[in-house]
Amino acid sequence: MDATAFHPSLWGDFFVKYKPPTAPKRGHMTQRAELLKEEVRKTLKAAANQIKNALDLIITLQRLGLDHHYENEISELLRFVYSSSDYDDKDLYVVSLRFYLLRKHGHCVSSDVFTSFKDEEGNFVVDDTKCLLSLYNAAYLRTHGEKVLDEAITFTRRQLEALLLDSLEPALADEVHLTLQTPLFRRLRILEAVNYIPIYGKEAGRNEAILELAKLNFNLAQLIYCEELKEITLWWKQLNVETNLSFIRDRIVECHFWMTGACCEPQYSLSRVIATKMTALITVLDDMMDTYSTTEEAMLLAEAIYRWEESAAELLPGYMKDFYLYLLKTIDSCGDELGPNRSFRTFYLKEMLKVFVRGSSQEIKWRNENYVPKTISEHLEHSGPTVGAFQVACSSFVGMGDNITKESFEWLLTYPELVKSLMNIARLLNDTASTKREQNAGHHVSTVQCYMLKHGTTMDEACDKIKELTEDSWKDMMELYLTPTEHPKLIAQTIVDFARTADYMYKETDGFTFSHTIKDMIAKLFVDPISLF
């Protein structure tokens, strides 16, 4: 058994008793928000006559976390924008924003529109900060072979970094910092709202109704998140982790933060709760099988999960037995929450867990045999499913509406290419963030070590290569996102959202394992309301 020690929970029982100070004002905030929604709806309809105004308004609503209130209006507007040529194709800001929004909404527009902004020597001609930001953000919706977008990223990054040395006005400087840290398309939508609301509040051309609605919308959502956290924390406490499972990562609040990053809308409350429980259970399985148990114990646990029956608990050592029975009980209770028409979906929760332990068993075998996969592709084939991204993304669909059909779940279990791109992004990001810690702890060979051993490189060189492969996987995802399927667009959108969460959690370090690195952001999302004044 590995003696790896993870730091204890940073939150404990905090959310069992906590209510944001806005809770007593909930009724008034809801009424005020409903009035403002209609006022903003009128503004959105009025913008339909001018493409630049429409694009500016749509991107503002998206960044403030308000777009889900106006899905039909925005879709209709963007269909008009897509079919219309009535815009200034010499304005790089407009061209970039049009490209960004249309691709983000699944319209396959050509990147050739950017070639006219290059001089005879092939260099971009841009001297405006807003244009640079717009081009940089648009370029990250690239697919394979779009050289002009690859060049745009290199050019604009260099220009934006230079601008930070100048004295930009505060709101613009904040924008440049945020953009260089993470391009707009890859940011978590709910965290973007938290970060952008104060920036938007500094803008001279802000719309006061939109700003007030954004603040109310966030504060109302925060109340829902805290109610979920109370329920989930009480569920988690029944495992008595501190006593019975002291060797695992106690990260229930971080699990919910992760799920909220991907499914932030209020109507997805059940989705967040189920996906959070699944993420926590997978974390326990991962730490048991990968870090703490003997090989024999890990294989017994895998066998029990394949059997999925209470009597299989008799196979297990004491520290696994109670967890296994609680796992079965939790999945059954998810069926009760889903109701008779959707309880069939718990079958897919079980199947996802079986996929996870099957992959974990393979990794244990590799570790015991000192086996190094011959290629990164071979590694990803087995290690992609064990990073957990597939399981948590699919479990989020379990709590969603009836538009996610049985056929959709069956399709997801075939590992469609879109799902593979998510697993690859998550695995590659995880490995670059945690490779030193895991290698020191005697884990199986990661994709980073696999590349080092096969190519004789240093760890830094291997990490650079893995980052290139991560970018390739993002391009794969974008191509697949733009490819129509018979399944609801919500599935593709949510899978992209989970890729964003992986990017956030593993950007600099393993933020899930070393959760003090994301504690301030968790507090911003769950603890601190946004002041209305």
Swiss-Prot record:
GO molecular-function term, one example from the UniProt record: terpene synthase activity
Residue span of motif DDXXD motif: 286-290
EC number, UniProt record: 4.2.3.47
Transmembrane domains' residue ranges: none
Gene Ontology CC annotations of this record: cytoplasm
The protein's annotated pathway: Secondary metabolite biosynthesis; terpenoid biosynthesis
Reported cofactor(s): Mg(2+); Co(2+); Mn(2+)
Subcellular location(s) of the protein: Cytoplasm
Family membership noted in the UniProt record: Belongs to the terpene synthase family.
Function: Sesquiterpene cyclase catalyzing the production of sixfold more beta-farnesene than alpha-bergamotene from farnesyl diphosphate. Involved in indirect defense by producing volatile signals attracting natural enemies of herbivores.
Pfam family, one: Terpene_synth_C
Highest taxon above the source species: Eukaryota
Keyword Metal-binding found: yes
Keyword field: Cytoplasm, Lyase, Magnesium, Manganese, Metal-binding, Plant defense
Ranges in coiled-coil conformation: none
Residues bound to Mg(2+) 1: 286, 290
Residues binding Mg(2+) 2, per UniProt: 286, 290
Record-given protein name: (E)-beta-farnesene synthase
Disulfide bonds: none
GO biological process: defense response; diterpenoid biosynthetic process
Species of origin: Zea diploperennis
Keyword rRNA-binding annotated: no
Swiss-Prot/TrEMBL catalytic activity: (2E,6E)-farnesyl diphosphate = (E)-beta-farnesene + diphosphate
